[in-house]
């Protein structure tokens, strides 16, 4: 099937356009693989993971996730404000969080909660930072420490995490 898909990192769902409607791809259990702009996506539980690297030794997958934080409300004359009492959470009422975009004002900020999955010998282990990587690879801790210090590895950059794992695995 050739469709225009989009992965929603807030809801962790695969979406596509059907006319003017945005539809969610469901059930995902019947899907093997999707390709988005050259990125290989595979179903895992109720969400999709991006396959960044695969080899006989290990695979590195990315769990793209964003947390939506309310940044403010539209006040007088369309200006964003945080003043006043907040009685209603629009999300709890099912109101589309994209409504603010139509007015050119984004009422939300998004916090990155992306994590990685390391697959070795059919076992999947999740990590977000160097401390959680130490826990799943305790025997490689000295090598990881040395590499991270020397290369100043940033865990929010998937390619840097991949290079670290290639060196230490």
Question: Each predicted region: which residue ranges?
Answer:
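Long, compositionally biased interface segments
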Residues: 124-169
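Aromatic-patch recognition
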Residues: 1-125
């Amino acid at each position: 099937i050739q469709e225009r898909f989009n992965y929603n990192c807030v809801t962790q769902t695969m979406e596509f356009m059907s006319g003017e409607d945005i539809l969610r791809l469901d059930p995902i259990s019947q899907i093997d693989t999707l390709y988005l702009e050259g990125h290989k996506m595979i179903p895992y539980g109720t969400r999709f993971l991006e396959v960044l690297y695969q080899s006989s030794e290990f695979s590195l997958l990315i769990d793209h996730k964003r947390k939506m934080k309310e940044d403010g409300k539209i006040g007088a004359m369309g200006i964003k404000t945080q003043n006043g009492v907040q009685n209603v959470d629009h999300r709890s009422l099912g109101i589309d969080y994209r409504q603010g975009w139509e007015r050119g004002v984004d009422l939300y900020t998004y916090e990155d909660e992306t994590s990685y999955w390391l697959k070795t010998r059919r076992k999947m282990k999740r990590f977000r930072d160097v401390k959680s990587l130490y826990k799943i690879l305790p025997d490689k801790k000295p090598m990881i420490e040395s590499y991270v210090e020397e290369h100043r590895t940033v865990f929010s950059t998937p390619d840097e995490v991949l290079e670290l794992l290639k060196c230490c695995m």
